[in-house]
Amino acid sequence: MTLEGFYKQYENYPLSVSDGISLASKGTEYGQVGDEEVLSAGKGRAYGVEFFSKILEWNNLNVTTTYTFFRSEFTDKEGVYRPSSWDTKHLLNLIGSYKFPKNWNVSARWRFVGGAPYTPVDMDLSTNKAAWNITNRAYIDYSNFNSLRLPNAHQLDMRIDKEIYYKKWTLNLYADVQNVYNFKSRNAPIYTNKDVDGAVMDDPADPENRQRIRIIDAYSGTVLPTVGIIIKM
């Protein structure tokens, strides 16, 4: 059993001039990194603890677990620490394997990840038709950057291996299935100004200037089977 702690400090990290957000938190949903003016004025920190333990070691059965609690934060233009886009807080892995006769091995891993932070949109600005037409998308509310969180996610992966030994090399045949029970993880929602038929949704109170926003729930995750061959010389 082991328990370790870590702490890392960042100084002079690039900070976007236009929206006041650290480039460390800019994923594909916020724009392309490198195409905007920045200042080397940001700070960041990453810290946490990691726990490892062998739960069971009996004959050919091995079960281990690792758990990490961590925080990843970077300052905004006001110097306030905000969660980075990778600040999921919790990471748990439960790993088990069993060696059968004749070089067969079966293993499984269950993984749990805390919900990632995401940023709401500025509804007042996004429902303004003139503003929407400039970017043709909803406006991120950077004043509430990463203030919301997605639900936690988890999945089970399983694998079976067969090793065949030759004089000068080893053949490893394997079959792997990721996300066995087909868990669908929640992604940040998608915002559109169109209905299901593709028509712009005018606001009846002010159809010339305002529009309605439709929120679409987004999910990812699928069962992914793989078979392969590994040759070791």
Stretches with model-predicted labels:
Residues 1-3, 63-65, 94, 106-108, ...:
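Transmembrane beta-strands of outer-membrane beta-barrel proteins
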Residues 6-10, 19, 28-117:
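Gram-negative outer-membrane beta-barrel transporters
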Residues 11, 111-136, 151-155, 162-233:
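C-terminal beta-signal and adjacent terminal beta-strands/loops
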Residues 17-27, 34, 70-71, 79-87, ...:
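Flexible, surface-exposed loop regions and adjacent strand-edge segments
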Residues 17-30, 103-150:
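Conserved small-residue
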Residues 30-38, 75-79, 138-145, 208-214:
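Extracytoplasmic loops and strand-loop junctions of Gram-negative outer membrane beta-barrel proteins
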Residues 40, 93, 146, 179-185:
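Asparagine-centered polar/low-complexity signal
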Residues 41, 80-85, 144-150, 215-217:
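Short, contiguous acidic/charged loop-to-helix segments that flank catalytic cores in large enzymes
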